[in-house]
Amino acid sequence: MKALVTGATGFIGSHLTEALLKNGFSVSCLVRNNSNLRYIEGLNVSLLKGDCSDPESLKDIQGFDYVFHLAGLTKAANEQESYIANEKGTENIVNAVLQNNPKLKRFVYISSLAAAGPSPDGHPVSEDAQEKPVSVYGKTKLGGEQHVKGMKGKMPFTIIRPSAIYGPRDGDLLVFFRMVKFGLIPYWGKSYYSFLYVDDLVNGIILSARRDEANGEVFNMSDGEIYSSDDIIDSISEALQCRPLRLAVPKSAIPIIGVIAGRIKSGSVVNSDKLQELRHSHWTCSNKKAVEKLGFAPRVKLREGAKWTSDWYRIHNWL
């Protein structure tokens, strides 16, 4: 079983690469010339040089049974950069795969709950709900989905919409761990989120690639629980054995924080696009379809996962 992973050097992609190897796949990783290979160094993988934004560099994508497309940007300096990375890049990789992979068994696109948007009524979002992304990131991930769906009948595919993903190597949730450790965390009222530990996600991704029932389908993936912002703070606090002060911040101040963060560092985890998402209080999804159709069975809940994540951060001097 020959598999190609794009985005293999990133947080989720590196975990997926390790899991594919453990499951007996022969893995190739599409990497750019300037990619940081620290998470896949020493793994028994082949490196294929290419860039999803450059169609000419993708001509060597040939003879794969499975393609897992994770490459993209969660935080971009501007809208055009996000479009090129998430939407145009997906179109390019889809076209490249179609040309030279006649025995392809599955193309798996890792999208995001951001493509569906927040829950409009407080109920967990299902896969058949009308998509209403509120951020540039969400809109470009939805654009990527549309390119994949446009290949129906020409290419077997599955689209995965993960909820908030966390675990070792995650740089996004790290900022909240650091805030808790510092002893002060901004709090703009109770919000609700779906989460999923990274090991459970990659197991679900591989499961979806192998199941015939997943062909042509979209699946939300979460651990099945709904966590309030208080639950999240409490889980991280317990993991770090800290008790931070919650600094009340009105939601009206969120855009101002985003502007300041954007000027301090482009692509920051707290940039204006990400804060646009945080203005909404229900980022929850139902994983019922994945559970019933695929037998998806996540094992790790937030309290346990936060402990494992904090241990990894400490061991690697991230905290």
Where in the sequence are the language-model features?
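Substrate-positioning beta->alpha
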Residues: 143, 171-175, 188-210, 216-220
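Conserved Rossmann-fold NAD(P)-dependent oxidoreductase catalytic core, especially the SDR/UDP-sugar
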Residues: 92-136
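Mid/C-terminal beta-alpha module of Rossmann-like enzyme folds, strongest
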Residues: 211-270, 293, 303, 307-310, ...
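NAD(P)H-binding glycine-rich loop region in Rossmannoid oxidoreductase-like domains
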Residues: 45-88, 92, 98, 116
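Flexible, glycine-rich beta-alpha linker
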Residues: 158-175
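Short alpha-helix in the Rossmann-fold core of NAD(P)-dependent oxidoreductases
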Residues: 83-90, 97, 108-111, 140-141, ...
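N-terminal Rossmann NAD(P)H-binding glycine-rich loop of SDR-like oxidoreductase domains
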Residues: 3-23
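Active-site Tyr-X1-5-Lys
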Residues: 132-158
